[in-house]
Amino acid sequence: MLDFVNDYSEGAHEKILQRLLETNMEKLSGYGTDQYCESAKQKIREVCECPEADIYFLVGGTQTNATVIDALLEQYEGVVSADTGHISTHEAGAIEASAHKVLAIPHKNGKVTAKAVKQYFADFYADGNHEHMVFPGMVYISHPTEYGTLYSKKELEELSIVCHEYDAPLYLDGARLGYGLVSEENDVTLADIASLCDAFYIGGTKVGALCGEAVVFPKNNAPKHFMTTVKQHGALIAKGRVLGVQFDTLFTDNLYFEISKNAIKTADTLKQALKEKGYTFYIDSPTNQIFLVLEDERLKELEQKVAVSFWEKADDNHTIIRLATSWATKEEEIKALIEIL
């Protein structure tokens, strides 16, 4: 059985496992205060070109989003997101559980536009009863999006301008950031993201790490007592070294970017073969997620040999599925899948 369900099925890159083993018996301070966390932070500051950045290592994506959003918002505020955004669809109401509403707006290929965001803010403040409503306090985006699509630098610049106009932080979810950054269609760098966003995170869980995400407040702008908020959300681990060693390794010799390239390379190979075979794509994704529209009978046959991710029903007789490659996908797996398809 081949498995293309997601990009976090494997454990971790061998270099990470090697470093975890090499440092295993060292006695280190806890909660992210060890030398490896500090080394990783410095390397991230360098690649992001933001020497004053505040950086924190959290355990996973949902915890990270819930923690950052809760820390950035006032009690009466919510977060603007695409209706397809991860916080709106696949985080079990984690944002709402911290008493903040997700203010969903229509997406365009998984993205929100500066025009739509500006219109939302303008409509809100034009309403004479807006004091009785949930205030839009920040904007959430992801790069890549849930559809594997990417924001251009121009789009980020436009969003940043709107957010500054309304004094609303722009927060970027980077769960799959490595895959986005190495895509041929990407024109955004980590330095660009650090310049245009008020907060973002660099995903490790889906890009070669066992677990962990690196939260970056690029302008020395972490919310007051942010570590306490991290603790309250259960996103702080005592053995912070586990995350520090992993990110220190990922940002040594460009490992994070090099292993990300494998996901794009294998996805591109698969997409080309699918195009040649005449398959119907639901959306054109330039990263590691491929969305196909299949007849239900064909899907039943495929699922006997390949594990895929259900996305949504296209109509009564067709289903949209997702195939995901990763840093660990082997060429042999792609060849085998192409033969089956």
What is the predicted function of each stretch?
Residues A99-P144, Y151-E158:
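PLP-dependent aminotransferase-class I/II
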Residues V102-L103, L170-L172, F281, V308-F310:
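Hydrophobic beta-strand scaffold residues
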